[in-house]
């Protein structure tokens, strides 16, 4: 979701978007002053932008800058009011409710028929059973806080590594949530996306803490 150190300069008139510039060099605190100065202008107020455009702006902000924006505009994004992050942010506590989420993980082969192949006389003595099987090694994640798991549909999450070992993706990327029948709108999806990015950065322990940020609405 969030692209760190990227900021938007927006020019609009009469509700029509005229120009958007993505600027990387400005310090994080600039987004607060930009929001404050923009709100003072008669015809260009961030808190009066169409919701779709406001949500689009939030996509380019880090969690810290998003919280600054909420603090200034008194307006959260309808799309990103539930955020999962591996970083323990300890500032702007009035903007969000933070919950520590204990996560356990283990590895498992998916779509594996190695045992069946070993029972076949033709393959039993083969040293290439794993290659013939073509199974995938997945990391299965479980949330120990059952209240959080049920509220945000964080059940049975399996993530696999890409064949070129350059990234991770959900084992069933096109599957809708079985509870709410949604995909992109379900917090489960943002949790999976965040976990994939987390896996790319470091080796995951069997037990670790993640953080749930519920933005005040």
Swiss-Prot record:
Q: Which SUPFAM superfamilies match?
A: F-box domain
Pinpoint the F-box domain residues. Answer: 43-92
The protein's name is Uncharacterized 14.2 kDa protein in PK1-LEF1 intergenic region
**What species was this sequence derived from?**
Autographa californica nuclear polyhedrosis virus
- Please name the Pfam families in this protein's record: F-box-like
Say which domain of life the source belongs to.
Viruses
State the disulfide connectivity: none
């Amino acid at each position: 979701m969030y692209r760190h150190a990227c900021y938007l300069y927006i020019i609009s008139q009469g509700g029509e978007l005229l120009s958007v510039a993505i600027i990387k060099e400005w310090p994080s605190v600039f987004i607060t002053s930009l929001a404050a100065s923009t709100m003072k202008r008669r015809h260009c107020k961030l808190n009066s932008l169409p919701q779709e455009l406001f949500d689009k702006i939030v996509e380019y902000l880090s969690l810290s800058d998003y919280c600054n924006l909420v603090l200034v505009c008194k307006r959260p994004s309808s799309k990103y009011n539930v955020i999962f992050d591996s970083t323990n942010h300890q500032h702007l506590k009035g903007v969000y409710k933070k919950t520590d989420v204990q996560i356990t993980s283990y590895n498992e082969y998916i779509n594996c028929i190695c045992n069946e192949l070993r029972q076949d006389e033709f393959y039993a003595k083969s040293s290439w059973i794993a290659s013939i099987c073509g199974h995938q090694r997945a990391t299965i994640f479980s949330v120990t806080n059952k209240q959080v798991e049920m509220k945000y549909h964080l059940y049975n999450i399996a993530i696999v590594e890409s064949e070129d070992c350059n990234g991770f993706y959900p084992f069933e990327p096109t599957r809708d949530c079985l509870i709410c029948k949604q995909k992109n709108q379900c917090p489960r999806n943002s949790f999976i996306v965040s976990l994939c990015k987390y896996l790319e950065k470091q080796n995951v322990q069997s037990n670790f803490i993640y953080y749930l940020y519920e933005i005040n609405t």
